[in-house]
């Protein structure tokens, strides 16, 4: 039996699946991956992306932060791909209980997923730091320089977790809950290099830990099933 056939059999036998995904889930929708060879970290800017996407850079160089953010982080024309849609189908069928994602693009919800735990926030939520008014991603995209609140003139910040910022505690606790209760944990499209997110797999207690990634990860030896392939290729074969 091939590794993909084994995977399909596992999905069939499971009814408490959790999917934990990273940038590789959205690359097939045309959204750049930070850490892949042709990803954002290997492109040339005045500052490395991890510096630009930090809290201190946002505070001290807000306009420059937003120039990069609009250019590279707001991919509003991107559409969900096969993996997003299959995960939504699995949830609708009652087999998948949660999607835990490191992505900020909102494509899981666009595909129909309901229970999505966004560890790093979402580009679709933005708020005024002064009065708390919320704004959508289009407002940010269409504004010039530093976006300001149309009610009070306050500075607007995206609801995304920047470097030097902590993850939302409730989202983390929810992720731990779902992963610790899962009978199958599928991890896809993540280098498993960012903590505390990568540490979440320590909470999985089952024997169906599946890693789907084109490249190797530090956790490969812990997987019950390792599939080195594109996510779309694998998920495209699931029949719900």
Give the residues covered by each predicted segment.
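Conserved catalytic core of sirtuin-type NAD+-dependent deacylases
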Residues: 1-240
């Amino acid at each position: 039996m091939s590794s993909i056939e084994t995977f399909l059999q596992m999905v069939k036998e499971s009814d408490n699946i959790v999917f934990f995904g990273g940038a590789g889930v959205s690359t097939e929708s045309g959204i750049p991956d930070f850490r892949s060879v042709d990803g954002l970290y290997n492109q040339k800017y005045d500052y490395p992306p991890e510096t630009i996407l930090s809290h201190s850079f946002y505070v001290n160089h807000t306009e420059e932060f937003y120039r990069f953010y609009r250019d590279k982080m707001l991919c509003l024309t991107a559409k969900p791909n096969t993996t997003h849609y299959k995960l939504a189908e699995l949830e609708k069928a009652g087999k998948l209980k949660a999607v835990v994602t490191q992505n900020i693009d909102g494509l899981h919800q666009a595909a129909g997923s309901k229970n999505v735990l966004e560890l790093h926030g979402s580009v679709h939520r933005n708020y005024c730091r002064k009065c708390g008014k919320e704004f959508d991603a289009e407002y940010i995209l269409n504004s010039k320089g530093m976006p300001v609140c149309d009610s009070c003139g306050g500075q607007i910040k995206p609801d995304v977790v920047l470097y030097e910022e902590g993850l939302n505690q409730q989202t983390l606790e929810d992720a731990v809950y779902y992963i610790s209760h899962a009978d199958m944990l599928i991890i896809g499209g993540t280098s498993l290099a960012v903590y505390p997110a990568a540490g979440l797999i320590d909470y999985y207690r089952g024997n169906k830990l599946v890693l789907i990634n084109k490249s190797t990860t530090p956790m490969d030896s812990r997987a019950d099933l390792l599939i080195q392939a594109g996510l779309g290729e694998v998920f495209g074969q699931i029949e719900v």
